[in-house]
Amino acid sequence: MGNHFTILIPSYNVEKWVERNVTSALNQQYDNYDIVYIDDCSPDNTFGPAKALLEEAHDQGFPGTIKVEKNSFNKGKMCNVYESIHAAKDNTIIVILDGDDWLAHENVLSYLNEIYESDDIWMTNGSYTIEPTGEVVRPMISDDYWTGTMRKKSWQFSHLGTFRKELFCKVKRKDFMNQQGQYWTTTSDQAIMWPIAEMSGPDHFRDISEVLYVYNRLNPISDDRVHRQDQLSTEQIIRNKKPYAKLERL
């Protein structure tokens, strides 16, 4: 049966890309996975097409569990991701697919399953293609990257980020929040990936050169376009947090 995966799709105002996004998740040639789709109170028509596609797949015998919901108010990606991961099945592997992006091909989960066949692998990050330029971006993580404080180094833990649920759950909730106790409104990737990478260390991490993800740069409301200052200030706060200690076991 293979490892169990949960594809988590946090979405907001992405109606132009719903079909491509959701279809890339549904078309995986793999049986043991769930899909969780969260529309964060989009004012556009994101939810309707997503709900229709996912409900149709369910009715046609999709092998896993499908959850699709629309928030009554905007919670932000960080809150949605945190709550959804904690509600996911135990022993699942989380695959975060942003609502305006898509998986690169139908064998992404099969590829990841081979990597996670080793219990020693707790997390991965990978390579992606930029839409529309076609540029391929790959992680550049040398042995030296793991020495010292990685939060002070260049950001390397980008798409596609995957990890075991149990690893994520070891990150303190307060580290996903500002001093007022509110979830970060931007920069959730760094808030997630740095702590779990610190706990994993190189022995429990795998960087992937295979392109598994398409990163869509056509979205005019992406955080780096409309919330750049908040993104930069939040990143600095996260960089300055105390690193997590490396774990010997999950």
What would you call each of these model-derived segments?
Residues M1-L250:
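Nucleotide-sugar donor-binding/catalytic module of glycosyltransferases
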